[in-house]
Amino acid sequence: MADQSLSTEEYPTEIHEYLMAFENSVGSVDEMLKKMMSVSRSELLQKIEPLEQAKLDLVSAYTLNSLFWIYLTTQGINPKEHPVKEELERIRGYMNRVKEITDRKKAARLDKGAARRFIKHALCDPTSEEAPPAKMDCKAKKKRK
């Protein structure tokens, strides 16, 4: 912390534990931001696909606004009444849209050719009234007609 001269006896132990956890979290965020800032943005964007670029931009914007939310809280300002709340909601909306697009890409796709063959062979019924002998397949049945 900034002022190490305060002893833990001057404030409750619970607060000290929370402050230490907060300090560790801020340190982790700082390390991540340093890693992210060490690579140039244009270099990074060249290596990833457009959808991944959108995800990166959204996560960056969300992280920055979340940090600002924390800053406002530490300054005694209610962030729920600040425009940052609307910005976070807007970013969440875009994140949901990107998630929908990602889910659509991952969804099973219909192979029309395979479906057509499957239906064609499933509908071939050699036991119908006009059916050829049981050992004949559907192709032979078509040739007979």
From Swiss-Prot:
Superkingdom: Eukaryota
Chief localization: nucleus
GO cellular component, one term: cytoplasm
Keyword Nucleus: yes
Coiled-coil region(s): 84-109
Any one Pfam family match given in the protein's UniProt record, by short name: Sas10_Utp3
GO biological process terms, semicolon-separated: maturation of 5.8S rRNA; regulation of gene expression
GO molecular function: DNA binding; RNA binding
InterPro entries xrefs: Exosome-assoc_fac/DNA_repair (IPR011082), Sas10/Utp3/C1D (IPR007146)
Subcellular compartments: Nucleus; Cytoplasm; Nucleus, Nucleolus
Keywords: Coiled coil, Cytoplasm, DNA-binding, Exosome, Nucleus, RNA-binding, rRNA processing
Protein family per UniProt: Belongs to the C1D family.
Assembly, per entry: Monomer and homodimer. Associates with the RNA exosome complex.
Function: Plays a role in the recruitment of the exosome to pre-rRNA to mediate the 3'-5' end processing of the 5.8S rRNA.
Protein name: Nuclear nucleic acid-binding protein C1D
Lineage, broadest ranks: Eukaryota, Metazoa, Chordata, Craniata, Vertebrata
